[in-house]
Amino acid sequence: ATPFGGSSYEGH
Protein backbone atom coordinates (compact mmCIF):
# COMPACT_ATOMS: atom_id res chain seq x y z
CA ALA A 1 0.00 0.00 0.00
CA THR A 2 1.00 3.68 0.09
CA PRO A 3 3.67 4.50 2.71
CA PHE A 4 1.89 7.12 4.82
CA GLY A 5 4.17 9.67 6.48
CA GLY A 6 7.03 8.96 4.07
CA SER A 7 8.22 5.70 5.67
CA SER A 8 8.29 2.15 4.32
CA TYR A 9 5.21 1.05 6.24
CA GLU A 10 1.50 1.22 5.48
CA GLY A 11 1.02 4.14 7.87
CA HIS A 12 -2.06 4.37 10.04
From Swiss-Prot:
Keywords: Blood coagulation cascade inhibiting toxin, Hemostasis impairing toxin, Secreted, Toxin. One of its GO terms (molecular function) is toxin activity. Expressed by the venom gland. The keyword Secreted applies. GO terms for cellular component: extracellular region. The keyword tRNA-binding does not apply. Coiled coil: none annotated. It comes from the Eukaryota. It is found in: Secreted. Disulfide bonds: none annotated. Anticoagulant protein. May prevent the complex of factors Xa (F10) and factor Va (F5) from binding to phospholipid surfaces and to prothrombin (F2). Also blocks the activation of factor X (F10) by factor VIIa (F7) and tissue factor (F3) as well. This is Coagulation factor X inhibitor.
